[in-house]
């Protein structure tokens, strides 16, 4: 399990995802620096969760599970969440692709 960002929001997301899914692999990365937000903001995240809990579920079902797990944060602190929810049997150690830099938002 790895965590690429260690701010308080990232740590909370990691803790909640780990408790809910007991993942074989977990990455939580704050991508707010790619967006037009104040320095140090933790608003935009991507997560990669590899878990047996996702076996036999469609992508939309896996995403709903993650969104439900993080519902409080999505309603308050987190503005955007990119999800890679992968069944353990389908994971081959691949890393997430880099997200593109934000091209919109206030002041762009």
UniProtKB/Swiss-Prot annotation:
Signal peptide: none annotated. SUPFAM superfamilies: BolA-like (SSF82657). It comes from the Eukaryota. Pfam families: BolA. GO terms for cellular component: mitochondrion. Residues 89-108 are annotated as: Disordered. PANTHER family: BOLA TRANSCRIPTION REGULATOR, BOLA-LIKE PROTEIN 1. Belongs to the BolA/IbaG family. This is Putative bolA-like protein K11H12.1. It comes from Caenorhabditis elegans.
């Amino acid at each position: 399990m790895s965590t690429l960002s260690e701010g308080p929001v990232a740590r909370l997301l990691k803790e909640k995802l780990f408790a809910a899914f007991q993942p074989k692999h977990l990455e939580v990365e704050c991508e707010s620096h790619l967006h037009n937000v104040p320095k140090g903001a933790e608003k935009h995240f991507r997560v990669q969760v590899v878990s047996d809990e996702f076996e036999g579920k469609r992508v939309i079902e896996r995403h709903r599970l993650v969104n439900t797990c993080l519902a409080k944060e999505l309603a308050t602190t987190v503005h955007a969440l990119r999800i890679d929810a992968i069944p353990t049997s389908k994971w081959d150690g691949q890393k997430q692709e880099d997200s593109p830099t934000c091209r919109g938002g206030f002041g762009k």
